[in-house]
Amino acid sequence: MANFPASLLILNGKSADNQPLREAITLLRDEGIQIHVRVTWEKGDAQRYVDEARRLGVETVIAGGGDGTINEVSTALIQIRDGVAPALGLLPLGTANDFATSAGIPEALDKALKLAIAGNAMEIDMARVNDKTCFINMATGGFGTRITTETPEKLKAALGGVSYLIHGLMRMDTLTPDRCEICGENFHWQGDALVIGIGNGRQAGGGQQLCPTALINDGLLQLRIFTGEELLPALFSTLTQSDDNPNIIDGASAWFDIHAPHEITFNLDGEPLSGQEFHIEVLPGALRCRLPPDCPLLR
């Protein structure tokens, strides 16, 4: 692999002491691969390191962390307007790793790192909310948002993605649906939503396939709404993905407008955004990402 250009790894600070990762990087450096490593400490670090990556002339910026880290790095990359932006590499090190998992990124660190450096760079879409905040994987509202936002860090560290489900079951008595109106291309719905998923990617909340047919290079966003008054049946519908469930509404559009009479919160790759009006649009071919040849998210 000695002929591959240099890469810069932006590593979430929580993984800075990951010994297997240190060993994998050392082995690749011994093979002649140039890998710069930078560790994030606070919000804004990813943007600064992407700027540094441009100055260093690297061809790949690797996001080492969970969906939030991938979001920060990819958002910084699409801000580059002059010249060709570095490609995005994925190194899944978070609690759930929803985007990387659905994209088929290997779980083994050494294999994921090699793919992030040497994999084919494919153009993929991103999405933008209210002309400002971006997401690469999914925007979730309702039950899913409240659970992923409120699940304690210690529970996530101990149990991983299943912690979201456990915390959700514990909070059943306090969760109510959100009344809203959602419009898109040839789509209109109004009612009470228990769960809303608007996906560029397919899964969120620790492995739940909210938008199972989503693709990241088709110029569309997939929508799935779980309706109804009773939360427990909707939760089990989320887990079983019943195709004939009358409480599941699906749609696809390059954009969606959402209006609610009260404030609701969407979770954008782990980042909460609250309001009553949301305009969500796809950004076709917004960045290049190094993905496996059999990536299930590509058409």
Swiss-Prot record:
Pfam families: DAGK_cat, YegS_C. It is found in: Cytoplasm. ATP binds at residues 40, 66-72, 95. Keywords: ATP-binding, Cytoplasm, Kinase, Lipid biosynthesis, Lipid metabolism, Magnesium, Metal-binding, Nucleotide-binding, Phospholipid biosynthesis, Phospholipid metabolism, Transferase. Probably phosphorylates lipids; the in vivo substrate is unknown. SUPFAM superfamilies: NAD kinase/diacylglycerol kinase-like (SSF111331). Residues 2-133 form the DAGKc domain. Its cofactor is Mg(2+); Ca(2+). One of its GO terms (cellular component) is plasma membrane. Mg(2+) binds at residues 215, 218, 220. This is Probable lipid kinase YegS. It is an enzyme of class 2 (transferase). Its main location: cytoplasm. Belongs to the diacylglycerol/lipid kinase family. YegS lipid kinase subfamily. GO terms for molecular function: ATP binding; lipid kinase activity; magnesium ion binding. SMART domains: DAGKc (SM00046). PROSITE patterns: DAGK (PS50146). NCBIfam families: lip_kinase_YegS (TIGR03702), PRK13054.1 (NF009602), YegS/Rv2252/BmrU family lipid kinase (TIGR00147). Binds 1 Mg(2+) ion per subunit. Ca(2+) may be able to substitute. Its EC number is 2.7.1.-. The active site is at residue 271. GO terms for biological process: phospholipid biosynthetic process.
